[in-house]
Amino acid sequence: MNLHEYQAKQLFARYGLPAPTGYACNTLREAEESASKIGAGPWVVKCQVHAGGRGKSGGVKVVKLKEEIRAFAEQWLGKRLVTYQTDALGQPVNQILVEVATDIAKELYLGVVVDRGTRRVVFMASTEGGVEIEKVAEETPHLIHKVALDPLTGPQPYQGRELAFKLGLSGKQVSQFSKIFMGLATLFLERDLALVEINPLVITGAGDLICLDGKLSADGNALFRQPELREMRDHSQEDEREAHATQLELNYVALDGNIGCMVNGAGLAMGTMDIVKLHGGEPANFLDVGGGATKERVTEAFKIILSDEKVKAVLVNIFGGIVRCDLIADGIIGAVSEVGVSVPVVVRLEGNNAELGAKRLADSGLNIIAATSLTDAAQQVVAAVEGK
């Protein structure tokens, strides 16, 4: 679950991280009043959306007059911002952030992630701030410095100082960076975060460190014990189908293709999408119905998949372990009948009672194609989309 920049900076302030003074505004009046609260300009106005690339799309602007703040608010509030990270429709702009402009001497990068390889929370820092860290990692990986936190001892001030020295910081900047390091580590661990990015972390003209931007992503599996973060969730920034699937405890991610995929198991779902691509198809989604592929869950999954107008066919790939494939077949038949599926449905069943399940699908009289293997399923669904 992603947070807005202004929400990230609110949390930064609680954990002692320095950030520019600013206010999130929902109306034109609030935007104008915020400038008076901050004091003399110049100011920076930023659209609040869950996407990067705002500046290149006109969603971030430095202004010197209050009239410019009002004009920016009129331009964007209630509109949609399209960036290279959004789809063609863009993301709705419901708030803008007005904050004091910062005198920037140098830009750094600081991020925190969970490294699955080392099973540690890892800090990443670089002197190449203000650009995408993925680009830095690809072109100049030696400029990224890493520190892993020991789960027993937790973050240590000396680790922050080590990173500061590697970034070329000196004097008061070392102690400032160490404080940011410790505060950010505490924030990450206490709030069950999955990702933090401060890009850029800037050195001001006076030589101080300021968190100029903030991106926070919370671990969705831990939200049950983070009520405050749950309240910060902005559903308007999420795909409606994905949000609905989350409420039903279905793992759904919308994609750009036209072949709907329904699978039990995340690994099998990724493999299914791969083989669809291999045979020339384009997946419309990732959808994992989980281990309990009941009729109710399959029905809701069909509804979500078919709410995407791009879907021209559906591939159902189920591996029956403890769950019996004949019962799953009954669920698929019931779901197809109830939902009124009008596109071809290709089903591949494997495992417990797979043959009986395939027979029930064949005898159902519905527009369901029983595949004999995963390769056959992929070929059949691609052919169905192409009208062959």
From Swiss-Prot:
Binding site for substrate: N264, G321, I322, V323
Name of protein: Succinate--CoA ligase [ADP-forming] subunit beta
Needed co-factor(s): Mg(2+)
EC numbers, comma separated: 6.2.1.5
Function of the protein: Succinyl-CoA synthetase functions in the citric acid cycle (TCA), coupling the hydrolysis of succinyl-CoA to the synthesis of either ATP or GTP and thus represents the only step of substrate-level phosphorylation in the TCA. The beta subunit provides nucleotide specificity of the enzyme and binds the substrate succinate, while the binding sites for coenzyme A and phosphate are found in the alpha subunit.
Pathway: Carbohydrate metabolism; tricarboxylic acid cycle; succinate from succinyl-CoA (ligase route): step 1/1
Residues annotated to bind ATP: K46, G53, R54, G55, E99, T102, E107
